[in-house]
Amino acid sequence: VDYSDVEDRSFHLDCARKFFTKDWIISLIKDLSWQKYNSIQLHFSENEGFRLQSDTLEAIDGFQYVNNQYLTKQDMLEIIQVANEYHIEVIPSLDSPGHLGAVLRYLPSDYSCASLFPSDGRRAQCFNIFTNDEARGFLIDLMTEFIDFFSEAGCKRFNIGGDEFLEKFSNFSNEQYVQIMEYFNEVSAIAKSKGMTPRTWNDGVMYGNYTGYKLDPDIEICYWAAPQNCASIEKFVQNGNKVIN
């Protein structure tokens, strides 16, 4: 049997900005197997489109999938089945609390951060988990729907997001930043309760000199960018987090 000589040889597929059919993704998985990959991260939600069937979203009045292009949950189960046969781990990726413009456009305006950070270019794509308990509850419900679905399908890891929820993380007060970290820890706990290992992108977590929080050390960190005041790899390692670079 031939296999990768590294622990995590992964392929990230953005199937949210651009829609890919079930058959196309299955064909890619087969090719990845021949190239000794051992995992594929399927990123199915972006500002440009939410591409996986959702009971939570379909309950919103007027909600529509962009161009009616999306994978059904049955499609995803078939993708996971083929991936298992080819020894490719499927890692779902649902970015939050930002990159959710395709969802927020169907929700009340105060569900987004537009009123809190009016000068920030990404405000309308970020859920207001600071002052709107209904918005926070909705987002937790959405994350829980897919944590439940993918854990029941046998997936072991889940990327809960964490990147680019605002253009300037320095806009946060210390109290607001603590709320962000509490959100990540809460979603992490939900994933762990279902036997999944949570992961996030690095740029929005442990940022700058904010204090008063402790990031869950069980969260895997996908270290993809290092803008000013971002936590270093060393800082994550000291916190106990596994870093993927």
Residue ranges and their predicted role:
Residues 1-159, 163, 190:
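Feature activates predominantly on carbohydrate-active enzymes
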Residues 123-220, 224-241:
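Active-site neighborhood of glycoside hydrolase catalytic domains
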